[in-house]
Swiss-Prot record:
UniProt function note: Nucleoside triphosphate pyrophosphatase. May have a dual role in cell division arrest and in preventing the incorporation of modified nucleotides into cellular nucleic acids.
Provenance organism: Corynebacterium glutamicum (strain R)
Catalytic activity field: a ribonucleoside 5'-triphosphate + H2O = a ribonucleoside 5'-phosphate + diphosphate + H(+); a 2'-deoxyribonucleoside 5'-triphosphate + H2O = a 2'-deoxyribonucleoside 5'-phosphate + diphosphate + H(+)
EC class (word): hydrolase
Keyword annotations of the record: Cytoplasm, Hydrolase, Nucleotide metabolism
GO terms (BP aspect): nucleotide metabolic process
Cofactor: a divalent metal cation
Signal peptide location: none
Protein name per its UniProtKB record: Nucleoside triphosphate pyrophosphatase
Molecular-function GO term, any one: nucleoside triphosphate diphosphatase activity
HAMAP family: Maf (MF_00528)
Cellular compartment(s): Cytoplasm
Cytoplasm as UniProt keyword: yes
One GO CC annotation: cytoplasm
Length: 197
């Protein structure tokens, strides 16, 4: 038995690796834009939970004896939910909006084992630094934030521009270890059952 990560996110994989788990990676093929459109008007937490669930549900049938984890993160700032910026221009625009401000990173988790499905979200408050225009442009030029929810990373270059967080750091990076641990316990497992040691 193993943990299957229904994601191609290097950050989610690194979180599990640093916690002693070498997950099997099976990226989910989900039309996120269509799902987001169908969830229009839903609460932000529900949106990220449903995105995570869709990813896990696509992958789970291929791994009936394994624990499948789907995840999705988005940044809630000024009552607007933001995903990945994808472009340099969008990254710069977002950073000019979020610098010096506070926002909430919401991460949805879906953990499936057999017929059991656990869906939960975690929220962490982010206090963004007053980053200079030059630093914002250079950060965007690095390419690092283009495929990250909220256009930032906590664990790499983006860490320069985060003054503080309130909540779970692993959730900000993309997968809350406390949420996953609680889910494993509910499924009758120990976290250490999945350590590759």
């Amino acid at each position: 038995m193993q943990i299957v990560l229904a994601s191609q996110s290097p950050s989610r994989r690194k979180i599990l690796n640093s916690a002693g788990v070498e997950p099997l990676i099976h990226p989910a093929d989900v039309d996120e834009d269509a799902l987001l459109h169908s969830l229009n008007g839903s609460a932000p937490e529900e949106i990220v939970r449903q995105l995570a669930l869709a990813k896990a549900q696509v992958v789970a049938p291929s791994y009936p004896g394994d624990v499948v984890i789907g995840g999705d993160s988005m940044l809630l700032i000024d009552a607007t939910l933001q995903g990945k910026p994808h472009t340099r221009e969008a990254t710069i625009e977002r950073w000019k909006q979020q610098r010096g401000n506070k926002a909430t990173l919401i991460t949805g988790h879906a953990i499936i084992f057999g017929d059991e499905v656990i869906v939960e979200s975690s929220s962490t408050n982010i206090h963004f630094a007053e980053a200079s225009d030059v630093d914002i442009e250079r950060y965007a030029d690095s390419g690092e934030p283009l495929e990250c929810a909220g256009a930032f990373t906590l664990e790499a270059l983006g860490g320069w521009f985060i003054d503080s967080i309130e909540g779970d750091p692993s959730s900000v990076i993309g997968l809350s270890l406390p949420v996953v641990r609680r889910a494993l316990y509910r499924l009758g497992f120990n976290a250490s059952d999945f350590w590759n040691m």
